């Protein structure tokens, strides 16, 4: 009887750690801003997803998830068996949102999307976008003038 309880506990533990399956052709991407873009002030980030659907957190339907936007963080550092954190570097969009407006301080920043399942965990295989690097420019900082060519002299 004791071994039966141990086996049941082991199965339940493995089920709790199991990741939700995602189609192998799922593609998560950032529509805007573009990689390398220079941005002034608050800006919109638009999320894109192919071959899966976007839903609210907690929805256990197959092939759907919700977005998490990583700001100056790397998806490689996430624990696949734990919920994706929710903090200023890991923004959670559990209402099924597909865009957000960010206001970041001047400087270089990275943005990366991760699709979370009903329990805010990473899918298997992971559905993660490429990183986008942007530079937020202070609107008060004057731009350097471009070098002007001298007009050719006529003879």
What does each model-identified segment do?
Residues 125-145:
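Short beta-strand elements
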Residues 76, 116-124:
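Short acidic/polar inter-strand loop motif in beta-rich domains
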Residues 48-59:
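Short amphipathic, basic-aromatic surface patches that mediate peripheral association
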Residues 41, 65, 105-107:
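A glycine-anchored, Pro-Gly-centered beta-turn/N-cap motif
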Residues 20-40, 141-155:
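Short, compositionally biased P/S/T/A/G/V-rich stretches that sit at domain boundaries
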Residues 59-67, 128:
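Short coil-to-beta strand junction motifs in C2/discoidin
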Residues 80-102:
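A beta-strand/beta-hairpin structural motif
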């Amino acid at each position: 009887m004791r071994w039966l309880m141990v086996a049941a506990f082991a199965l339940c533990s493995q089920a709790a750690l199991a990741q939700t399956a995602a189609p192998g052709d799922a593609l998560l991407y950032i529509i805007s801003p573009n990689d390398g873009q220079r941005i002034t002030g608050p800006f919109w980030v638009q999320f894109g997803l192919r071959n899966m659907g976007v839903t609210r957190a907690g929805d256990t339907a197959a092939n759907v998830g919700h977005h998490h936007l990583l700001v100056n963080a790397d998806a490689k550092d996430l624990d696949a068996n734990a919920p994706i954190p929710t903090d200023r570097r890991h923004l959670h969009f559990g209402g099924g949102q597909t865009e957000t407006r960010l206001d970041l301080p001047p400087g270089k920043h990275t943005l990366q999307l991760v699709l979370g399942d009903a329990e805010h965990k990473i899918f298997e295989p992971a559905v993660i976008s490429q990183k986008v690097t942007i530079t937020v420019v202070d609107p008060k900082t004057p731009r350097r003038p471009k070098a002007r060519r001298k007009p050719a002299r006529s003879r």
